[in-house]
Amino acid sequence: MDRWQDIKQVVVVGLGITGLSVVRHLRKTQPQLQVKVIDTRPTPPGVEQLPPDIALHVGSWNDAWLAEADLVVTNPGIALATPQIQTVLARGVAVVGDIELFAWAADKPVIAITGSNGKSTVTDLTGVMANACGVKCAIGGNIGVPALDLLEQEVELYVLELSSFQLETTSSLHLVAAAFLNLSEDHMDRYQGMDDYRQAKLRIFQHAKHGVVNRDDRQTYPETSHGQQSLALVTFGSDDKEFGVISHQGESWLSYNQQPILASRELKLVGQHNVANVLVVLALLTCAGIDYRKGLSALKSYTGLTHRCQVVADNRGIKWVNDSKATNLASTQAALSGLNCAGKLYLLVGGDGKGADFSPLKPILAQLNLQLCCFGADGDQFMPLHASATRFERMEDVIEHISPQLQSGDMVMLSPACASFDQFSNFMARGDRFAELARQYA
């Protein structure tokens, strides 16, 4: 079936990295189409890279262009509930995202991962281990390279990280294996409630052959009403079932059906949440028919991703930890649960809170030798959580204030539990700035 048969005019909504990848893909694969780009920002990122013959409208919506479109490709950051998008849908015109276009074009097996936390680490490590097992693999989606740009690479397997936003506009993605890692409160400024958010995540199983779900979080299990009778479920968790954890030779081991795979202490990744992440990777590789035993040496040497519990400076016995990727409550909870700090923990929290409730942090913080440093637009929301809480405007102000107090055994950790958009372009920019400050003051 030729999906493009009746499509002549395409409007791409939102430029940036994703929008540019859509324009490049359409230009290369469907040169007959008339492509126009709308971005409501006055100077959108990537505007200088847009080919000069592509019509561009910035600073507002262009209702006339949307009214003429046969297909609208929207950025995942734009909610389907947006009135202009609703008007397009009411006309019976399809509104898709870049992942749906990828699904139309991909001709190799695809593994995809979603969840509130851990999906970037799982995606990256799945790709690293697949390559180590001799399967040429490309990694992207919501992490690093846009999905459509992966189609340029000669590979045998694609591994995609998918956000709930991306899944909302995806309906044709056939997966050899799909994982739903966990569900915790996030993006409540976008969704009507937790069930709304969960339903978006569950879309990952729509055309999946195997589904990897979390025994410790039943919310990750698909509902039978979804009509996915052909979906074969594989589970992971902290007990000894399927992909799990056993006691073997007096210590904790990762296991499959109670057979030992690897001692937990052999992992370079820190924290219990990362043991779960590794179990998911082993499950996904198994579902894709890849013998993970060939990649265990790569697993043992894997140190994780930048901005995720990453030690960026270690001087005079003081550790500086960049966990800028902790853009929600559960990420920060996970980081704190796996923590080993001999002295005082200086914890930097705050930013754009996305309407979340941070009170569940209070009992965790109460157990720590802590100085809570609250900054950014929603820093005030953290002030009632600990007696030590101090308010700052910017991250720089925090570091300047605490640096004279630091002693050997202390840890300075950025794990903000918030998005970065109040003061930074993204979580990477925030983490890079923290790393700069760490090197300066360490």
From Swiss-Prot:
ATP binds at G115, S116, N117, G118, K119, S120, T121. It comes from the Bacteria. Pfam families: Mur_ligase_C, Mur_ligase_M, MurD-like_N. One of its GO terms (biological process) is peptidoglycan biosynthetic process. This is UDP-N-acetylmuramoylalanine--D-glutamate ligase. Keywords: ATP-binding, Cell cycle, Cell division, Cell shape, Cell wall biogenesis/degradation, Cytoplasm, Ligase, Nucleotide-binding, Peptidoglycan synthesis. It is an enzyme of class 6 (ligase). One of its GO terms (molecular function) is UDP-N-acetylmuramoylalanine-D-glutamate ligase activity. Its EC number is 6.3.2.9. One of its GO terms (cellular component) is cytoplasm. The lineage of its organism: Bacteria, Pseudomonadati, Pseudomonadota, Gammaproteobacteria, Vibrionales.
